[in-house]
Amino acid sequence: MRTLWIVAVWLMGVEGNLFQFGNMINHMVGKHAVWSYLSYGCYCGWGGQGKPQDATDRCCFVHDCCYGRANGCDPKLSTYSYNFQNGNIVCGNKYGCLRHICECDRVAAICFQKNMNTYNKKYKNYSSSNCQENSDKC
C-alpha cells in the first residue's frame, strides 16, 4: 500500500515536499529517488518498523524521526524554499515548519550520498515481514 500511495503522488507531480525531497536525492546521489529508495529496507518509503537494515535504511529511519519532530507541520506536502550551491543543498526558509522540513530532507539526501556504498539491491522492495525486531528509538 505504501508503494502505491507514494508512486501515485509522484506521478501526479505534486509540487510539495515529496517532490522536493526526491529532487534533492536525485541531485545528491544521481539516482531516481522513487525507483532507488521507495520500499528500500524497513524505513524507506511509507511508514517504517523494525531495525534499519543498513546505513542507507538508517538514513530513512533518521528522516522519519525528523519528520516525527515536525509538530504541527505537514512534512509530506508543505512546499519549502531551497537551492543548490556548490554541490550543497541550502534551505531558504529561516524559521519554523518549512525550515525544519527542508533540513530533514537535506540531511537525508546528504546521508544517502555519504552511504551510497551501503546500498544493497537485496533490500529493494524488502518485505515488511522481515522488519519485526523492536525499533530503535528516535
UniProtKB/Swiss-Prot annotation:
The keyword Nucleotide-binding does not apply. This is Basic phospholipase A2 Pla2Vb. Its main location: secreted. Belongs to the phospholipase A2 family. Group II subfamily. D49 sub-subfamily. Its EC number is 3.1.1.4. Expressed by the venom gland. Binds 1 Ca(2+) ion. Its cofactor is Ca(2+). It is found in: Secreted. The lineage of its organism: Eukaryota, Metazoa, Chordata, Craniata, Vertebrata.
